[in-house]
Amino acid sequence: LATSFKKDEKVYAITAPFLIDATHPLYNVNDVLNGIYIHGNVIGDVMFFGAGAGKLPTASAVVADVVDCVKHKGRNVMTLWSYEKLELGSAMEVERTFFVRIKDRAALEKAKEAFHAVQTVTVDGLDDEFGLVTANMTEQAFAQAAAQFDVAGRIRFDKTTI
């Protein structure tokens, strides 16, 4: 998932694996389909959805855009762009909730404390591994906590921004 937002005159952007709630419109985007979910200050929430991944769908979309440009040649839409350079904020400053897998069952209590865990996930038969859902924390705080453990994987999720 690629996501971005503007806060305090900085723009934050990241492309990474995310968990998406089943009630979110992007949840059903899969296979060769792409989706764009936008929240605008005037328009509110809108979503664009369609073929776009793979050789033929991508080519079809490009041809359709070119045909549309030719059909509307000479018609311009005035847009108000600013040449002011925006400052890119560090993704390490952004707060998120994470699901993290750790390959050291003996470190469970230490990991719960380090990640301020709100939920522990264990699976019967996987005696050497566990998962945690963290409290809301910055990417930087997550990286510092993760450096202490044998992390098998992480996935971000944040219902407030996606």
Positions of PLM-derived features:
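NAD(P)-dependent dehydrogenase/reductase Rossmann-like domain
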Residues: 1-162
